[in-house]
Amino acid sequence: MVMAATRGEVAWPTIADRVRLAGGVMSQREGHAVAANFGSAATELAICVKRVGLAVRSDLDALEIAGAEPWLAHFLEESLGGRAPAAGEAVRTARSWCCRVAPDRAVVIGPWSAAARWAGIVRHAVLTGAAIDFIDRSDSATALTLVGPRAARLLDDAGLEPDLPVGGVRESWFAGSSALVLREAADRFLLVLDAEYAVDAWQELLDVGRVLGLSMVGAEALERLAAAPGRIF
């Protein structure tokens, strides 16, 4: 087993190790290993529809963009076609979410290729004089999806307040890590945590969610769910 994450002198399993040990059948998405399923995509889809599923989103990358409020607002307006999200809001664009977590900070979460495009846009803006900067969070952040009719209750039980509107985002604290919480849909949440504490967060969600029927789900179940009538992802 690869023990890539370390705290002091002690080596800890990574979230990828835990996914494999949990039975994840791995496949490639944009050159990155992703859990396609945990035995049956059909069963996992039913879990997402009837209970609550937890997915480790190694198919997603994160990019943090920072700058004084006027500069960041102008950059986001230009990049998003006219309206920058207010603090606490997220905008869905080109398979990604642009989350304004503070007046001077935004986090973009999306597929690796989309995050790379955003990084290119930021670099171009900096070269043309914009007073903004970015941090590539590909090695320091982990994204988790909770989806299903019991997802909000699970977050509430875990101490992560789920009372956000769809498209609402807030920063919180969970399992020793700062945590971005985004409500993607009425029954779907995206969490972005420090990678160093991703295993702790994953385990805590599993422990809290056991009484709610929480199970691991893979990318195939999420893709099937997105293809259902009335769903956008």
Named regions from a protein language model:
Residues 1-233:
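Basic, glycine/lysine-rich polyanion-binding surfaces/domains
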